[in-house]
Design a protein with these regions (language model features):
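N-terminal pre-ligand scaffold of iron-sulfur
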Residues: 1-63, 77, 81, 90-113
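Short cysteine clusters
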Residues: 49, 68-71
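Short helix-to-coil "ATP-lid" hinge immediately C-terminal to the conserved N-box Asn in the Bergerat
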Residues: 74
Length: 113
C-alpha cells in the first residue's frame, strides 16, 4: 500500500504564505494544528502544547527546534520529543503538492517516528 493510500491528506495553506510567516495555525477537521517552516521543510504539530496548553503556533523556531511561548520547552520537529524530557508533542505527516501544504489530521504514532 502506498503512502497516498494510507494517509488522509487535507489541503491547508499555500506554501508561499507559510514561507513568509514561518509559522501558522490551521484548523483541520476538529483539530487545531501548528505548521512551521524549519529550514526548507514543513512540520505540523497539534497546536495545543502538552505541557501548559498554550498555542504552539505562537512559538518560534530556534536552532532547528520549535519553542513553546509559555515555558520555552523545545520540541524536535521530526519527532515531537521535548528536549530533555520524556514527553512528546503529537506530530502529523506533511507534504507540499502544487504549492499547497497538505497534512494528515491523524497524529503519527510513536512507532512511526
Amino acid at each position: 500500500m502506498s503512502d497516498t493510500d494510507t494517509k488522509h491528506w487535507i489541503a491547508t495553506v499555500p506554501f508561499a504564505d507559510l514561507a513568509r510567516r514561518r509559522r501558522t495555525r490551521v484548523e483541520v477537521g476538529d483539530r487545531a494544528l501548528a505548521l512551521f517552516l524549519v529550514g526548507d521543510r514543513v512540520f505540523a504539530f497539534d497546536d495545543v502544547c502538552i505541557h501548559k496548553g498554550r498555542s504552539l503556533s505562537r512559538g518560534v523556531v530556534w536552532q532547528g527546534r520549535v519553542v513553546c511561548p509559555a515555558h520555552q520547552w523545545a520540541f524536535d520537529p521530526e519527532t515531537g520529543r521535548a528536549e530533555g524530557r520524556d514527553e512528546c508533542q503529537p506530530v502529523h505527516d506533511v507534504r507540499v503538492v502544487d504549492g499547497v501544504v497538505h497534512v494528515d489530521p491523524r497524529p503519527r504514532s510513536q512507532e512511526e517516528i
